[in-house]
From Swiss-Prot:
GO terms for molecular function: 4 iron, 4 sulfur cluster binding; iron ion binding. Homodimer. It comes from Pseudomonas fluorescens (strain Pf0-1). Binds 1 [4Fe-4S] cluster per subunit. The cluster is presumably bound at the interface of two monomers. Its cofactor is [4Fe-4S] cluster. Keywords: 4Fe-4S, Iron, Iron-sulfur, Metal-binding. Pfam families: Fe-S_biosyn, NifU. NCBIfam families: YhgI_GntY (TIGR03341). It comes from the Bacteria. Belongs to the NfuA family. This is Fe/S biogenesis protein NfuA. [4Fe-4S] cluster binds at C152, C155. InterPro entries: Fe/S_biogenesis_protein_NfuA, FeS_biogenesis, FSCA_dom_sf, HesB-like_dom_sf, NIF_FeS_clus_asmbl_NifU_C.
Amino acid sequence: MTAITITDAAHDYLADLLSKQNTPGIGIRVFITQPGTQYAETCIAYCKPGEEKPEDTALGLKSFTAYIDSFSEAFLDDAVVDYATDRMGGQLTIKAPNAKVPMVNADSPINERINYYLQTEINPGLASHGGQVSLIDVVEDGIAVLQFGGGCQGCGQADVTLKEGIERTLLERIPELKGVRDVTDHTQKENAYY
């Protein structure tokens, strides 16, 4: 069973849109493109009868059916579709707090686990300085090769951040990881935080 919420206001707005399509049985399909990545986007599309996929979860609502993409469903946990009126008419919003969160566990490949901790624990802190760090590769000796960007590229504190923050966090979370290495060109200082 899906944990997505479609508010009454959103339901009524969508029902009105669907009624204008002149297609009996038309519903909506909710899905996420590139789920579990920083590029994830939550989408709602019209879904004519027969366009739904057999593996979709059908969510029967008062006036129409919402089909939830099976691959996206776990990422739509706690999602809320709402409609708010304003002076310009109104706006449909989709808040899906788990859309960009990778689904990993102890058996996931090491690169997926590293990316998970970079996205959920490390990059949110670096974002306050306008920076981020990305995984480039995991080399054979168990070293994660990382690259800084934004305000972290060229920052005078990058070495401290790498060793005291990033490496310490990753080594605590991923026991088989042996260390991290920075391949950033820190001579580029235009956007550096420090």
